[in-house]
A protein has these predicted regions:
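Short glycine-centered, acidic/aromatic-flanked micro-motifs in structured strand/loop junctions
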Residues: 1-3, 32, 58, 116-119
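Residues that form or flank phosphate/diphosphate-binding pockets in enzymes
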Residues: 7-8, 37, 64, 123, ...
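Amphipathic helical "hinge" segments at domain boundaries
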Residues: 1-45, 49-53, 130
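Bacterial carbohydrate/catabolite-sensing allosteric modules
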Residues: 14-26, 47, 71-78, 82-264
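Short acidic active-site motifs
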Residues: 38-42, 63-65, 155, 159
Length: 264
């Protein structure tokens, strides 16, 4: 796994671990701390330990990942990133992004700033962003300001703060709830009000996001389903059963109170 302090990762791990335990397997968890080299060496180490299979919650799929996957003689399942030459379980990031873009346009927003992450993370950095942009475009919003940050709340806060000193959108869309919360911190710091002055949408559906007042509009991916599917799929691969190479996880758009209807 890339980290242990992510709510999303925790949800996936807990359901996956329980499913595997219920089916007679023991889970070994290695935290790579977003370090690609550590990720690759961990795969090699697990392979040498003669484990039955490996589940990789990847932040990127590089040529090095593809090379190591090609030489393994045990199943390797990618979770969270698309792997064209093998089996992967991913969130339907494009469709989720598209629905958010469509919703923002429906609520009358035209001055929009999207704060995303690097395209190195294809799922969030490319597919989710493209979904938002196309959802807006297909519903009459031809331009959106695009900014890039990492996954930390604090960096998102600084980027949003700098942007707000030059421009004021009617809506911030954060590629994650953490990024959206960074935007909220900047909004509050400048004595602006959410959603009266600036609306806010995130992705993640963390329970904490619903305790914000007004509650955050966000996309919740079914992380528990991801965990169960990962457990089922790795067992199927170990047993030599046929599985779908690409499995999409669904989502729900939670319409909180953080988006002002500008049509009224």
């Amino acid at each position: 796994v890339p980290c242990l302090d992510s709510i999303t990762t925790s949800r996936v791990l807990m359901t996956m671990d329980q499913y595997l335990k219920d089916h007679g397997y023991t889970t070994l968890i290695i935290n790579t701390n977003h370090d690609e080299m550590r990720e690759l060496t961990s795969i090699e180490q697990l392979w040498r330990m003669n484990v039955d299979g490996i589940i990789l919650m990847a932040t990127a799929v590089t040529m090095a990942h593809q090379n190591i996957a090609a030489k393994l003689d045990i199943p390797l399942l990618f979770v969270a990133q698309r792997y064209g030459a093998g089996v992967s379980i991913i969130n339907d990031d494009y469709s989720a992004g598209y629905e958010v873009g469509k919703y923002a346009a429906y609520m009358g927003h035209r001055k929009i700033c999207y704060i995303g992450v690097s395209g190195k993370d294809e799922a969030v950095g490319i597919y989710r962003k493209d979904g938002v942009i196309n959802g807006l475009r297909d519903n009459g919003v031809s331009s959106v300001d695009l900014l890039e940050t990492d996954f930390s709340l604090e960096k998102a806060h600084l980027i949003a703060l700098d942007y707000l000193k030059k421009k004021q959108p009617t809506l911030f869309i954060g590629a994650t709830d953490n990024i959206a919360l960074g935007c909220l911190k900047a909004i509050n710091e400048l004595k602006l009000k959410m959603p009266d002055d600036i609306s806010l949408i995130g992705f993640g559906g963390y329970e904490t996001s619903q305790f914000i007042n007004p509650s955050l509009s966000t996309v919740r991916f079914n992380n528990e389903e991801t965990g169960i599917k990962a457990g089922q799929t790795i067992i199927d691969l170990i047993e030599g059963n046929v599985v779908d190479n690409l499995q999409l996880i669904g989502y729900t758009l939670i319409k909180g109170q953080s988006v002002k209807d500008l049509n009224k």
